[in-house]
UniProtKB/Swiss-Prot annotation:
This is Cell division protein FtsB. Residues 1-3 are cytoplasmic. It is a single-pass type II membrane protein. It holds the Pfam family DivIC. InterPro entries: Cell_div_FtsB, FtsL/DivIC.
Amino acid sequence: MRVTLVVLLALFLALQYRLWFGKNSLPDYWRLQQEVSNQKNTNENLERRNQLIYADIEDLREGEDALEERARNELGMVKKDEVFFRLVPDRNP
């Protein structure tokens, strides 16, 4: 009986060691859960960004207003017979 108890105790301790410190232990599992959660958040952010980009692409394909706005803001273009004034702040106030 005593030998069986010692063997069972040794087996229990070996399994506990693997559970807490071995490969695929609980701390590894918790770390991987955190990594999966972080990756899901990153994927959601990228999905939202992609949706915005798709909306911009659709606006550029559909209407001229978005195209004109981009040309004005990003390329500094102006319409024919239109005057553009740039106000530069004074460097020495």
